[in-house]
């Protein structure tokens, strides 16, 4: 939301450059590769129709993310000793997932699709860390019978970063009639979070 294609690609490139700024001085440190998943966006902030349009496009794009997760799982299976292709050389790197703002809404619905595509089996652990930055999803999304209750299965660790001064959260909360946002004040019941899920309050940063 409020990010057009050019801004999304520019942000991804800037992140990759930042993560690799020290690797050129250290021959043993490997470069980090950033892969961007984007969806149609109006790139506007204050227009209600733009927000709703972006939200619908985000939801409709989530099936592609779910399919991508399964393709990644199948590829990682080929790296197991019993199935390993001798032509594939492992890089030894870890995989992380970063979702920003409405990207967490994409992830939310991707989990619903993944559950169906995976025949309701346990989610594969694909990532070392999932970073949920300013998540534009409900603040009770990790509770029982909600779509992110099993997100922790996808990674060894999940971290939520929230900011109670985030303008986009206000727009989502009050203009669109959504329930309280996870990216605004964190989870509704922090004591019920899975032990792999933690929160960081970025309001004073």
Predicted regions and their residues:
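Short substrate-entry loop that stabilizes the transition state in hydrolases
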Residues: 2-8, 22
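Lipolytic serine-hydrolase domain surface
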Residues: 9, 13, 17, 27-93, ...
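Short catalytic micro-motifs in class I SAM-dependent methyltransferases
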Residues: 1, 101, 109, 134
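Residue in the alpha/beta-hydrolase core beta-strand immediately N-terminal to the catalytic nucleophile
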Residues: 96, 100-101, 131
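Active-site micro-motifs of SAM-dependent methyltransferase domains
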Residues: 3, 104, 137
